[in-house]
Amino acid sequence: MPDLDLSPDALLSSGSRLPAVTEWLTRAVWSQDRFATLPREDYLRSGEAAVARAEELISVGASRAWDELAAETTRAPTPRAFLGLDREPATARAPARAVVVFDGLSLRELPLILALAAQTGFRVDESRVIATSLPTETLDFVSQRVLGPDAARGIGPNQLPSVGALTARGVQAVYLDSLTPRISLTAGKSLLLWSTYPDRLFKNDQARFDTQLFPQFCEYVATLWKYTIQAVPPGVPIVITSDHGYIFFGGTAESARESAAADQLGQQRSCVFEDAAPYPAPHPDLQRFPAQHRAMLRGRLKTRPKGTASRRLYQHGGFSLMEVLVPWVLLNRN
């Protein structure tokens, strides 16, 4: 197998390091060739180990790349903008478009998405890596990237079908919580389809083996594709994206360094500090957002929360390459 390690030269650039990192992720680590030729568990294990080594390099010698990643979250395209929800006046309607959010979809699944598009007669007009909202949690994505100024605090994806600001703009939101949902999509309307997969699999407390969840999701996707992408009416452009990625902690995909950063966050991957609480001092393993009184754990440090959450091999909520960087794929039917 060719060497997957990120070249240190990519992190020594005087300019932005992030373009080289994202190119390495999609062309070397999570490449279509590796996905097509390797057993699923080997693809997962070797890829995550390579990303873990890269994140350690960034953490100990190129921390400016973390700040670049934080800045990139403010420049990424959003489902809200793609669906025309920022148009004025509030009743203005954009041409019909569709956004399909696969909850928890990561860059490791991008080759699978591209392969399915080719197999089912879709043209890939754009495939890129974007930085999702911070923190890397579902409710924050809904608030920041979907509803924006229309958001009420704490709206979850299952509530999107009843959000008046979407229906007023001619957007039909559908929450898909099964592999084979029975849905009726209205022709002429923009669509926001939210699938609970792969999140439904990856947050399973009982799934302890790296060979179990990722291959299982790969098997499920063909069915999900039929009830999401292929269900969109012809002629409607479709964006596939995700609210957050998942970091994998199986095998060697975990930092062995000792760090006090996780303790400062109460063994959580992200924490908001009350106004009266002491805010963490700068630390190489913390991404700090003082204006929001928030701090997030950088890279591959594994938290040790109490309870069953500590056993999860797949986690999100923190500030790592695999949690923050997600796919953005634009499809049209051939």
Predicted regions and their residues:
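Feature captures the catalytic ectodomains and active-site-proximal regions of enzymes
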Residues: M1-N334
